[in-house]
């Protein structure tokens, strides 16, 4: 599955547009990460536990979007975007979305 942020893929033609696709996940903070975050807030620095959690959440959202695209018969996603929003005080939602297309080499 090719996934690009652009509206076209060099060397390929769009054969068919399959439609909007998305994948999402909501991740919550772990109590251990909250304690670490509180300490890091006092001294500064990267909160590695949160960075890792968000990276895994992005990967999961992208994977779910790719599954949605495959279910629609697509072999690529163009116009790919990621969006993060706070759902509640201790949870973040990651949404991956784009346009599913069927492409072929030029």
Curated annotation (Swiss-Prot):
Q: Which domain of life is it from?
A: Bacteria
Return the similarity comment.
Belongs to the UPF0145 family.
For this protein, the record's PANTHER family field holds:
UPF0145 PROTEIN SCO3412 (PTHR34068:SF2), UPF0145 PROTEIN YBJQ (PTHR34068)
Q: What is this protein called?
A: UPF0145 protein BH0643
- Give the species: Halalkalibacterium halodurans (strain ATCC BAA-125 / DSM 18197 / FERM 7344 / JCM 9153 / C-125)
Q: What is the lineage of its organism?
A: Bacteria, Bacillati, Bacillota, Bacilli, Bacillales
